Design a protein with these regions (language model features):
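Short Cys/His-based metal-binding microdomains
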Residues: 13-17, 77
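Active-site beta-loop-alpha junctions of metal-dependent nucleic acid enzymes
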Residues: 20-42
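Short conserved beta-strand segments at catalytic cores or DNA/RNA-binding microdomains
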Residues: 2-14, 23
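Conserved catalytic motifs of the protein kinase core domain
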Residues: 1-2, 47
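Generic secondary-structure boundary/loop-capping signal
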Residues: 19-20, 153
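Extended amphipathic alpha-helical interaction segments
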Residues: 44, 51-54, 59-159
């Protein structure tokens, strides 16, 4: 059973639980039902952005129910998924440090690109399927590719 909390941030930068549901499976139909039900409970007021893990079924449902909102990937989930998808490498402190620098601290696109390329090259990960998919979705999680969104919605800048 999957627990699906809906958490927001109030004007004091505190987490607020809007609702929670339990799903039997992780399929697009279930997530579509969940998001439509949530939207109805919020009087059809859509969120400005949605932060999720890398679940493809959830991504598909967001496209259907919230086609115009900003869908971002949660950095905490990416870090957790890295530990699961790259267990041999993520256990190496220097690799973990470099990977987390890419996730949280790159300030320019060129710094991101050079750091990413060096990490893949240095640890022989060129062609790794999980990292390739993560790179293809970099606009959804890498802050240097999200600046336009962040400046439009300053409420998402504060940590």
């Amino acid at each position: 059973m999957i627990c699906a909390p809906f958490v927001g941030v109030n004007h004091h930068w505190k987490n607020v639980l809007f609702g929670c549901a339990f799903l039997l499976d992780k399929i697009t139909v279930s997530f579509t039902w969940l998001f439509e039900t949530f939207l109805e409970s919020m009087r059809n007021q859509k969120p400005n952005a949605v932060f999720t893990d890398q679940c493809q079924a959830m991504k598909n449902a967001i496209r259907v129910v919230f086609p115009d909102i900003c869908h971002r990937l949660c950095l905490w989930h990416i870090s957790k998924n890295a530990a699961e998808n790259l267990p041999r490498h993520y256990g190496i402190p220097k690799f973990k440090s470099r990977f987390n620098k890419i996730l949280f601290n790159c300030e320019t696109e060129s710094e991101f690109e050079s750091s990413w390329d060096a990490l893949l090259r240095d640890y022989n990960l060129v062609g790794n399927k999980w990292l390739s998919t993560l790179y293809e979705n970099r606009e959804r999680w890498c802050l240097v590719f999200s600046q336009q969104f962040l400046y439009k919605n300053e409420s998402f800048i504060k940590e």
